[in-house]
A protein has these predicted regions:
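Active-site-flanking beta-strand signature of metal-NTP-handling nucleotidyl enzymes
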Residues: 84, 164-165
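Double-stranded beta-helix
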Residues: 166-170
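Beta-sandwich strand segments
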Residues: 50, 153-154
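Non-heme Fe(II)/2-oxoglutarate
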Residues: 1-53, 70-73
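Catalytic core of non-heme Fe(II) oxygenases with the double-stranded beta-helix
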Residues: 61-141, 151, 158-159
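Hydrophobic, well-structured mid-protein blocks that either form specific transmembrane helices
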Residues: 49-50, 54-62, 85
Length: 170
């Protein structure tokens, strides 16, 4: 499975500051090629007439996030990049949405450990956010300008590890 190989190839290559250090080794090139394939597929889903081939993409930077209980990642964008990606390498959290019935995107809906993307303005009957509970091996690609955040979770002893990065077009 491609996500599994990306996880295996990238998980143990961090520096002390959680920046991933790509080296000129086949495993790293293979992992990067798989990430680029996902980004290319994403661009094709946006615009079937003007999408980006793998050869049109370049890696700007990549890092690892290690998140423990009560640690949020606040609202931010990656405006310096055309595209951003996240690969969820490890997630020991329990999905807070299990058994929950959503009612008109209520403020009471569970958000523990979820990533939230915000788009557009808030208007009556016009949702402007998307919540996603990431599972291990999820690969998520989105525009760099899209505002997002990661909610903290309260589950003690749980952790989540993700590899994230920015990609630009050549």
């Amino acid at each position: 499975d491609s996500q599994e190989s990306v996880k295996d190839k990238l998980c143990h290559t961090t520096s002390m500051n959680n920046r991933l250090e790509f080296q000129e080794v086949p495993a790293h090139f293979d992992a990067l090629a798989e990430i680029f394939q996902h980004v290319s597929k994403y661009t094709r889903s946006l615009n079937t007439c003007d999408w980006r081939e793998v050869e049109d993409l370049t890696l700007d930077n990549v890092w690892m996030n290690v998140q423990h209980a009560n640690q949020p990642i606040g609202h931010h964008t990656h405006e310096e990049a055309n595209y951003a990606f996240v690969i969820y390498v490890r997630n020991t959290l329990t999905d807070p949405t299990i058994g929950h019935t959503y009612e008109d995107r209520s403020v009471n809906d569970p958000v523990d450990g979820m990533i939230e993307w915000r788009y557009g303005e808030t208007h009556y009957l016009s949702p402007n956010r998307m919540l996603h509970f990431p599972e291990e091996r999820d690969i998520v690609v989105f525009p760099g300008w899209l505002e997002h955040q990661v909610y903290p979770f309260k589950q003690e002893g749980a952790d989540r590890i993700s590899v994230a990065g920015n990609i630009n077009t050549i």
